[in-house]
Amino acid sequence: MEPYWNETNGHAAHPVKYESEAAVSSFPYCTESSLNFSTSATAYSEDDAEYATGRRNKTSRQDPLSHRIIEKRRRDRMNSCLADLSRLIPPQYQRKGRGRIEKTEIIEMAIRHLKHLQSECQQKESDYRSGYMDCMKEAAKFLYDVHMQDFCHRLLGRLQEHIDEMFKTDCYKSTRSCHMPDNVSASSGSPHQAYHPPLCHLRDMLATSASDVEHSQDHNDVKDLSFRNHLNQLQRSQQAAAAAAVAAAAVAVANGSSPASNAGVDSKVPLTNGGGTGGAPPAADNVPSNSTGSGSAAACAGGNSNSSGSNSSNAASSTICPPAGGSCPAKVTPLAAHQQPHQAPVITSTAPHHHHHHTDSSHHDFESSREPILHTDTSNMHSPPPRDLLLQQHPHLAHSHHTQDSLMSVRMRNYSESSHEIEHNNNYKYKNHIKERFVHELHDEETSSEHCPVAAHLQSDHSHLQALSEHSKDGTEPEIAPIMAKKRKLAEAAANGEIPLEVHTESSNAGASSANRLDKPSPSFNFSDIKDIKAELHNGNSNSSPLLAKLSAVAAAGGQLSTPSSTTAPLPPRHTFTVPIFALHGQGNYYVPLNVDYNALVPFLNGMDLLEKSYTSMPVVHPININVNFMPSSPSASLLAAAAAAAVAVGKQQQQQAVVAAGAGLPLSTNSAAAQAAAVAAAAVAKAKLEQAMNQSW
């Protein structure tokens, strides 16, 4: 009989694994050192360094308690790092109303931010290199136009060596290479003539430099004060030299020394600080750094002396050129015209855009920002030529310049919106927006409200408010506090009787009814009657109260509650609603809850309306603990309700009879009017008692 574990029967015996074969097995066993039941971060144990791998029954020097402490410290350190990262997240990225951000999301945001920083650094390096090359090209163009080819080649070679050495360092290592254009050679040869268009206008240079602003982020370096001071000194020396050259040329023309002027044009004028006209050509080694302005001015001064048939008057007129730059008269040769760039450096044309573009997007602000910021109040400095004069002298460039201005303004606005350096300006605009909204809401509250018409002395501020609202659109803060102070003073003056009555009354609805009111002496209610009202409310027998009858008569006759001055102007009508208050009882032990009409409280507020949105001088209210008695001893509410209903019915009947008599043309008797007033007074008293009983029954 064949055994069961035989290969011939198809039942091959499974291989049996032993611990000695565990080293070559592909299956993990408990004896392997790679198996670890702790967390993945603690795969290495300090016991592994002392005991051999695979040794059985090793005694661990690390007890479970210390392991838990180590794990807790590691988790605390990780949580602390995550908390630090979460505090670095800007507030605008916080999810409103969702609590804290998850830890994984914090780590993901940190990874994305680091990647963004790496790409941004590479972009800045590329932008810096391109800006450096553009500056080299502009310097080469300028030096070539003033016939300084040797100095131009040496300067370009030195600048190229400098940038090569700078980008070879560890800070600027990059795999990308930036090649110079083929038409500009830094080592040998002169720049190609086709690459250099004539510099007939400063605006061409401004357009070229401003178009590169959106690709370069290093233009803000011009805000350095030391660099700006250096440019100020350079410009002052250039303008002084130009003024001296123009004066010398004018003296030479006035003296009639035509050979000297011809020599000054045929030969190259020495570019010195004194600006003197000599006959020797300038040496490249002796050219100072501030010689460009004097050279251009001297060329402009003597540019017209070569023309045939020129007299002394024409020569004198040709020397009148702006020493600070600008275009020469039309008779100047093209070479002299090419030598008249504006004295403001090209790099400074980008700095004013950063200060002006965020206030307004109009072309006016963009044009005003083109004025150089380096001019100071000195005797030798003059303002640059205006844009209109330049466009008059070059009318064929007006349309192209307008198109360039619109494109540049759009680009600068887009650049400003994406820039992180003007975040404080955005916050400033947000504050202005809030104040602008406040002004508009105040204006709408005062003018467009149908039920709350504004008094005449308040309507006078409408134009001032509108001007402030328009002025706030320009980025300036509106001054609202003086307006509110003025309104409060007027209200206090009206409450004290210092303003006449006709100032506050409205002429639209001041017809015969107002005249009748003035003819009839209406009863008034004073502050001295409050104690009597408290006593009568406490006694509870105010059905025959003369004080409440007086109050109801005031309400029936249409009179107003007067302040002690008794000259308060009538206030405009308002919506009728009740205000819950707590009135101190006559005994002074507890408060009684009451509902008082808001119109009854207005005369006691010194002319201030608590419902206005512009009311900012709210009185300081301190919380206090009061005892409220909701169930005092009083007549039953049912009896008061019945009395009030009866009084209201009698009043309505009397009113209907009065209407019928008025329609029939019958004169109303004084008895009927008195009865009607008495009925209304009784109804008011009953209603007041009913409200008091209901409030006390709460």
Curated annotation (Swiss-Prot):
Keyword Transcription among record annotations: yes
Pfam family, one: Hairy_orange
bHLH domain mapped to chain residues: 62-117
UniProt keyword list: Biological rhythms, DNA-binding, Nucleus, Repressor, Transcription, Transcription regulation
Region of interest called Disordered, as start-end residue ranges on this chain: 257-319, 349-369
InterPro entries on file: bHLH_dom, HES_HEY, HLH_DNA-bd_sf, Orange_dom
Compartments in which it is found: Nucleus
Keyword Transcription: yes
Ranges where the record places region Basic motif: 62-75
Boundaries of every Orange domain copy: 128-159
A GO cellular-component term linked to this record: nucleoplasm
Gene Ontology BP annotations: circadian regulation of gene expression; circadian rhythm; dendrite morphogenesis; negative regulation of transcription by RNA polymerase II; regulation of circadian rhythm; regulation of DNA-templated transcription; regulation of neurogenesis
Biased composition (Low complexity): 280-318
Region annotated Helix-loop-helix motif, chain positions: 76-117
Effect of disrupting the coding gene: Strong circadian locomotor phenotype with most mutants being arrhythmic after 4 days in constant darkness and displaying a long period in both light/dark and constant dark conditions. Delayed evening activity peak in light/dark conditions and robust 26.5 hour rhythms for at least 10 days in constant darkness. Reduced circadian oscillation of Clk target genes per, tim, vri and Pdp1. RNAi-mediated knockdown results in a lengthened circadian period.
PANTHER family: BASIC HELIX-LOOP-HELIX TRANSCRIPTION FACTOR, HES-RELATED
UniProt miscellaneous comment: The name 'clockwork orange' is based on the Anthony Burgess novel of the same name and derives from the potential clock function and the presence of an Orange domain.
Biological role: Plays a role in the regulation of circadian rhythms. Transcriptional repressor which inhibits Clock-mediated transcriptional activation by binding to E boxes in the promoters of Clock target genes and repressing their transcription. E box binding activity is time-dependent with higher binding activity seen in the early morning (zeitgeber time 2) than early evening (zeitgeber time 14) and is dependent on the presence of the circadian protein per. It is likely that per binds to Clock-cycle heterodimers, reducing their affinity for E box binding and allowing cwo to bind instead.
Protein name: Transcription factor cwo
Organism: Drosophila melanogaster (Fruit fly)
Designated gene of the protein: cwo
